[in-house]
């Protein structure tokens, strides 16, 4: 099986940190990009988190988003442009935002599943 090149958004949050840890221990994933909404001046698992989301996503096959709704739509806009698959773990969307996600899902594959944190 070919490895999945993975980008994780919201890499400094609890779920982002868990995803980094899990992806590093799973031979099916190759962690290629980390993004955060603020500049981080240290490497995490050998990768420096980027504020430039579009450049970060180019090498990925799959983007996992654990940010906030506002950031999720920035992720979806870029992922749609680059034709990338997205897993959304972000919660707290309004009904209008849920409809917008459905529209994006007609352009790119999206798996949306809230409450993926450990213990749920």
What do these predicted ranges mean?
Residues 63-64:
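N-terminal Rossmann-like NAD(P) cofactor-binding module of classical short-chain dehydrogenase/reductase
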Residues 2-6:
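Extreme N-terminal starter segment of soluble prokaryotic enzymes
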Residues 31, 49, 86-87, 110:
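Hydrophobic beta-strand scaffold residues
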Residues 22-45:
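NAD(P)-binding Rossmann-fold cofactor-contacting core
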Residues 46-60:
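Short acidic low-complexity segments
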Residues 8-20:
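N-terminal Rossmann NAD(P)H-binding glycine-rich loop of SDR-like oxidoreductase domains
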């Amino acid at each position: 099986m070919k490895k999945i090149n993975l980008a994780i958004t919201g890499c400094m949050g609890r779920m982002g940190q868990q995803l980094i840890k899990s992806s590093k221990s799973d031979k099916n994933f190759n962690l290629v990009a980390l993004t955060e909404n603020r500049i981080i001046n240290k490497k995490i698992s050998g990768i420096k988190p980027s504020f430039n989301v579009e450049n970060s996503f180019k090498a990925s096959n799959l983007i996992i988003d654990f940010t906030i709704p506002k950031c999720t739509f920035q992720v979806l806009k870029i992922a749609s442009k680059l034709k990338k698959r997205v897993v959304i773990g972000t919660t707290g969307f309004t009904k209008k935002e849920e409809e917008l996600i459905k529209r994006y899902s007609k352009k790119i594959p999206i798996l949306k599943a809230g409450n993926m944190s450990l213990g749920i």
